[in-house]
Amino acid sequence: VKWSDSERAIITDIFSHMDYDDIGPKALSRCLIVYPWTQRHFSGFGNLYNAEAILGNANVAAHGIKVLHGLDRGVKNMDNIAATYAELSILHSEKLHVDPDNFKLLSDCITIVVAAKMGQAFTPETQAAVQKFLAVVVSALGKQYH
């Protein structure tokens, strides 16, 4: 993947200012609420029976934060994202049996939550960079499935 200087700057800036404790839980909660079939991978998280329960679930919040810290690894290794996520790809495919389409659903939710947080600062150029970055991560996480 080729990254322009502008894309690198946008991605680095967004993640350096991102409140992981806010964005992570909101993004994962949104994914579990909007796409309820994704909940099957989180059966050990306790009560996920409705939106209120999901939004208040400490395990969901903690995993959302963990996901964003995982994305931070990609930000720091933008030139080698596939290798950065090789072990996670194996874990999610061979042990957890996560449907790889779920990575795309979560990336869409991350984009929505970041856009809502940034407001008008989330320009089309910003969106393009964010979605490109997340698409590369999603592809890397799905490598083991192919």
UniProtKB/Swiss-Prot annotation:
One of its GO terms (biological process) is hydrogen peroxide catabolic process. One of its GO terms (cellular component) is hemoglobin complex. CDD domains: Hb-beta-like. GO terms for molecular function: haptoglobin binding; heme binding; metal ion binding; organic acid binding; oxygen binding; oxygen carrier activity; peroxidase activity. Residues 2-146 form the Globin domain. Red blood cells. The keyword Metal-binding applies. The keyword Lipoprotein does not apply. Heme b binds at residues 63, 92. Pfam families: Globin (PF00042). Keywords: Heme, Iron, Metal-binding, Oxygen transport, Transport. Hb1 is a tetramer of two alpha-2 chains and two beta chains, while Hb2 is a tetramer of two alpha-2 chains and two beta chains. Involved in oxygen transport from gills to the various peripheral tissues. Belongs to the globin family. This fish has two hemoglobins: Hb1 and Hb2. This is Hemoglobin subunit beta.
